[in-house]
């Protein structure tokens, strides 16, 4: 099964062609690396296949429900946030679900019987999703990945703007790993 199909992709800047008639497919389980000298189009290629940039010609098709993780070399970290807060952002969609579920519980006393039935079904669905996605293990996951990249030694409560460039890169990589994308 193809995860990614690129067909007849062309792209350039002005009169400089960067990609000419690029075609390939990435199958599930395959490992591919992208290497090249500075300024040869690696970032442009990644921007095209992740949908941030449209190719001049050709098609880029991802299989349904594939999550792509990409660490932008120019990504910025928000001043005032700790390493721990940035890493927990990898699970923001789960925190949002928890807020929705708690809101439903708070409003249940004012609901009709029909509304209550629907709310209970929705909260059960959310609870299953939280359980299935390891919501109650988030802090342990954050600690584990942070330890693996040496960030616990720096201190997870340290402001990200006080970090060196290499440490910031490790924070971004840790967050990306915690997001568990299908394609990294």
Feature annotation, model-predicted:
Residues 1-184:
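ABC ATP-binding cassette signature C-motif
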């Amino acid at each position: 099964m193809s995860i990614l199909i690129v067909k007849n992709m062309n792209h350039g800047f002005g009169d400089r062609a960067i990609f000419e008639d690029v075609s390939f497919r990435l199958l599930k389980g395959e490992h591919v690396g992208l290497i090249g000298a500075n300024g040869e189009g690696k970032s442009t290629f990644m921007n095209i296949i992740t949908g941030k940039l449209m190719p001049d010609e050709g098609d880029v098709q991802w299989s349904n429900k594939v999550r792509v993780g990409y660490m932008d070399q120019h990504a910025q970290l928000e001043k005032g946030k700790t390493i721990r807060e940035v890493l927990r952002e990898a699970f923001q969609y789960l925190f949002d679900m928890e807020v929705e579920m708690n809101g439903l519980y708070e409003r249940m006393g004012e609901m009709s019987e029909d509304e209550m039935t629907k709310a209970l079904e929705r909260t059960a669905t959310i609870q299953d999703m939280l359980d299935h996605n390891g919501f109650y293990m988030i802090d342990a996951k954050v600690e584990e990945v942070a330890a693996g990249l040496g960030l616990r030694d720096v201190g997870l409560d340290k402001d990200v703007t006080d970090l060196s460039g290499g440490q910031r890169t490790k924070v971004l990589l840790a967050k990306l790993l915690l997001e568990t994308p299908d394609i990294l």
